[in-house]
Every structure is written in C-alpha cells, then in structure tokens.
Curated annotation (Swiss-Prot):
Domain of life where this protein originates: Bacteria
Protein name as annotated: Bifunctional purine biosynthesis protein PurH
Native source organism of the sequence: Salmonella typhimurium (strain LT2 / SGSC1412 / ATCC 700720)
Domain comment (free text): The IMP cyclohydrolase activity resides in the N-terminal region.
Gene: purH
Pfam family for this entry, one: AICARFT_IMPCHas
Metabolic or biological pathway: Purine metabolism; IMP biosynthesis via de novo pathway; 5-formamido-1-(5-phospho-D-ribosyl)imidazole-4-carboxamide from 5-amino-1-(5-phospho-D-ribosyl)imidazole-4-carboxamide (10-formyl THF route): step 1/1; Purine metabolism; IMP biosynthesis via de novo pathway; IMP from 5-formamido-1-(5-phospho-D-ribosyl)imidazole-4-carboxamide: step 1/1
Source organism phylogeny: Bacteria, Pseudomonadati, Pseudomonadota, Gammaproteobacteria, Enterobacterales
Zinc among keywords: no
C-alpha cells in the first residue's frame, strides 16, 4: 500500500530535544519548510536553520505564558485539511497544508516524580496544544505524518530519500498508531495522578499521595509475541513498561539462545528478584517460580555449587540467577553439570559466553547492575477485576528482630536466620526454608498447611544428605500451632525466624523453649500467592 505523500512543510515543537537539530537539518536540506514554536524555534534558529515561528505564521502571538501557542485554525486547518477535498476552503482562509508534525509532550511524568512537586507544578506541565496537534495529525494520517518518537527520525529520512521526499501510507499509519499510544499513555498518567488525590482538591498530604487512583490506567508496550502461553493451547505476548528504572527481566538483553518462553520469563523474574536481596556473591536457582536452591559465598562459582546441592533434581531445567558477572569458570560448571533453561546475571565475560554458546538452546540474559529496589505496584488478575498492591520491598534489619525464646541465637544461627528469611519471601506460601552456613538445605513450598511445608523441607534435606542439625528455619507467616516447631525440632533445627502474631504465639514459643530452639520474631509477613 504505497499512496505516498510528499513532505513539503513540517511543524516541529518538542519538549525532549534529543536529535531534533539533526532531524530538522535533514528536513531543511531536503527542501522542507520548517514551522516551530517557543524554545524549539529558538534552538533551530540558533543553529542557523530557516524557521518560521508559528506566531508569525498565524499572526497571533503566543500568550498566557505559553499556554496558547498552536491552538489556531491556521495550524489545525493545515494539519486536518484533507488533500483534494478541503483545498478550496484552505486557500480561501490562507491555510497552508502541514505535511508533517513533530511533537513530544511536556514532561508530566518526570515532573510529578520529583520530590516536592506541587499541584501547580503538575498542572503547568499538562500539555494542551501538543496532544491536540498529535491527535489531529494522527487522525489525518492519510495525508500527514505525525512523529512523536526521536527513535523514528533516521528511518523517516531514509524513507524520504528512497521515495523522492515522500512517505508511504503504511509508514504514516504506523506513525499514527504510535501517536495515539503516546497520547493515551500521557492522558493516563495525568488521570492516575489526579485520581489519586480524590476527594481532596489539594491532595498533597502523605495520606492522599498513598491512595490508589479511582480509575487505574495502565500502559505497556509489546516487547515480543510468545510461541504460546503457560500452556501450549494459550496464546501469549510479553508487554513491558516504558522507561523502567530498575534492572529487570523486562529490560534485560538476551545475548544468546533461543526465544524466551512465557514460563521462562516468569521464572527468570522470580530468580532475579530473589538474588537482588543479597549483597554478597549469590546464586538463586528457580523451578516453577519457586527457589529450589539459594546460596551466598565469596565467589559466584561456590555460591552456584552450594545452591545446586540443595536440590539437584529440581535444578534440572531450572533458571539460574547471579548478582555478579558470569565468569568462565562458573559457566563451565553449569554447562558440565546440568540442563539449564536460562542464566541471568548483571553481565557476562566473553569467555563465559563462548562456553555457554556450546549449548545453543541455553538462554543467557544480561540485565545490568542494580543499586536499589524501586517502589512500584504489583498486580494480580482475577476474573472481572485486578488486585493492586505495593511491591513487597519490606525488609528487616538485625536491630528490628525480637528474640522471644529463652535461648538467644548464636551469631551463626542469626546469620542463617536472616539468610533464609530473605529466601522465604520468594517461596510460594505456605513457605518454609531451612538454611545452614549461608545455603538453603531444604525448601517446602506452596503447601496448604504450614506443618507439611516444614516436613517437606526436612525430607528434601534428608534426600540430599544435607545436615539439618543446627540449622535455621524461616516461615513466611506465623505458625498457627506448635506442630511446625515440633516437626522442625525432630530433624534438628535449632533456630526459627517467623513473623509472629498468632493467637497461639505463647504455645509456639513454649514449644521452642521445650526443644531448646531460639525463636526470632520479625513482625513482618511475606505471603506470596
């Protein structure tokens, strides 16, 4: 579908000026007349480009501190005018056709994200003329090209060169889709911001800022189509947020291997988010969204070796995450020892990638280093609705722990307790984690009763010949009965860390004292469903 339209006149008005000088120079060199506004016009003029201010073109000045610039019939008539149909009326009113509109909008998201942003600041960064021009041009895409992304500048110039200064309808239609997506996302941000202030007009208190908007508008960009979803009869795609600020599976670069599956992405996310909890060199192995082995050590090679020993059977076909660069020695250990679906790390050495390349199906992802966790929202889809909550970024320090048993934990028990507490946060509830000397030795996940999770963790440790005596046990939620403590004591657990908060806490603590177990309360729960 060709239907080319020549670009003879373009209107440029951008807040993000990245690449705009070079793009304007390229347009001007190809004989395109340039119209512009405000700061964009001044910038282009400073660079020696022939540019006409919109106010000079319309005969109407910018006014109200720039609130009114482009809202004029000579601008919108030039954009919306249908070639071959509205020519006479345009000529009668001295309206020149505008063939290309280059606009990006006031930085509303960046403004409201700044600490101390007032309602007045936010209001002044709501673009009016920009979205109006974008929508006008997108509506009239049969005749007009609308450009909202600087990443499209080079491709547009190349196509114009290939088509004697014209753009095809296919290109204009694709640009129009991007434009409508752009304005939809922009309006959604504004609606979410104002909606979170309801019912107070100046809803800038901490209480108001914590409210969820009354209408939740979400915008995600499709990154890839999947072969299928969780199961082969389900269709699926992977969508990501724009401008993600934290290293994640969404921003990771795949440097090797076949395409990621739906389950690969879900499990890789679980592994990466868990390994982020640790400052020391760490390895997390995940299977079906649950950690099956976690360890920290002085090197990632030793961390991997210890994590693998937790449950070699479950590690087969798993996802492996590191919080340090993947090196050749560790890559060789993985490839020689097990079948792995995905390896993700902040980076990988060239030597490591040469080794993993021997297994063509192994997917290797690099996600970059992370500094700190970024607050955000978690979503859970239910039939007919969406559950929304803050991300679980809750952490406890050693100083915040409460020892409620008669016996105090030893230094090693305390270290192991804090270690397995971090792991338990990422295990499906009911979650029980046994750990000793900075490695998991048994994990009980997803059981309907907590005592069975405790028993399963003990069984797994015994199956692998791992010594439970003197280990720590973490529980993601309180023990409703003493049976979980009795089960742990039976296999040799000597320290328990849990939130506390049961009406039977006294009975549970008494059980710990009977068995000589040190018990620590965190006063924080980590359910994961």
């Amino acid at each position: 579908m060709q239907q080319r339209r020549p670009v003879r006149r373009a209107l440029l008005s951008v807040s993000d000026k990245a690449g705009i000088i070079e793009f304007a120079q390229a347009l001007s060199a190809r004989g395109v007349e340039l119209l512009s506004t405000g700061g964009t016009a001044r910038l282009l003029a400073e660079k020696g480009l022939p540019v006409t201010e919109v106010s000079d073109y319309t005969g109407f000045p910018e006014m109200m501190d720039g609130r009114v610039k482009t809202l004029h019939p000579k601008v919108h008539g030039g954009i919306l005018g249908r070639r071959g149909q509205d020519d006479a009326i345009m000529e009668q009113h001295h309206i020149a056709p505008i063939d290309m509109v280059v606009v990006n909008l006031y930085p509303f998201a960046e403004t409201v994200a700044r600490e101390g942003c007032s309602l007045e600041d936010a209001v002044e960064n709501i673009d009016i003329g920009g979205p109006t021009m974008v929508r006008s041009a997108a509506k009239n895409h049969k005749d007009v090209a609308i450009v909202v992304k600087s990443s499209d500048y080079d491709a547009i110039i190349k196509e114009m060169d290939a088509n004697e200064g014209s753009l095809t309808l296919d290109t204009r239609f694709d640009l129009a889709i991007k434009a409508f997506e752009h304005t939809a996302a922009y309006d959604s941000m504004i609606a979410n911001y104002f909606g979170s202030m309801v019912p107070a007009y100046h809803g800038e208190s901490k209480e108001a800022a914590g409210r969820f908007p009354r209408t939740l508008n979400l915008n995600f960009i499709k990154k890839q189509d999947m072969r299928y979803g969780e199961n082969s009869h389900q269709q699926a795609a992977f969508y990501i947020e724009e401008n993600v600020k934290e290293a994640s599976v969404a921003t990771a670069q795949q440097v090797q291997g076949k395409a990621l599956s739906y389950n690969n992405i879900a499990d890789t996310d679980a592994a990466l988010e868990c390994v982020k909890e640790f400052n020391e060199p760490a390895c997390v192995i995940v299977k079906h969204a649950n950690p099956c082995g976690v360890a920290v050590s002085t090197t990632i090679l030793d961390a991997y070796d210890r994590a693998y020993k937790t449950d070699p059977t479950s590690a087969f076909g798993g996802i492996i995450a590191f919080n340090r660069e993947l090196d050749a020695e560790t890559a060789q250990a993985i490839i020689s020892r097990q079948f792995v679906e995905v390896i993700i790390a902040p980076s990988a050495t060239e030597e490591a990638l040469k080794i993993t390349a021997a297994k063509q199906n192994v997917r290797v992802l690099t996600c970059g280093q992370w500094a700190q966790r970024v607050p955000g929202l978690d979503f859970k889809r239910v039939n007919g609705g969406l559950l929304v909550q803050d991300r679980d970024l809750g952490m406890v320090s050693e100083a915040e722990l409460r020892v409620v048993s008669k016996r105090q934990p030893t230094e090693q028990e305390l270290r192991d307790a804090l270690f397995c507490w971090k792991v338990a946060k990422f295990v499906k509830s009911n979650a029980i984690v046994y750990a000793k000397e900075n490695m998991t030795i048994g994990i009980g996940a997803g059981q309907m009763s907590r005592v069975y999770s405790a028993k399963i963790a003990g069984i797994k440790a015994a199956d692998e010949g791992l010594e439970v005596k003197g280990s720590a046990m973490a529980s993601d939620a309180f023990f409703p009965f003493r049976d979980g403590i009795d089960a742990a004591a039976a296999v040799g657990v000597s320290c328990v860390i849990q939130p506390g908060g049961s009406i039977r806490d006294d009975e549970v603590i008494a059980a710990a004292d009977e068995h000589g177990i040190a018990m620590i309360f965190t006063d924080m729960r980590h359910f994961r469903h």
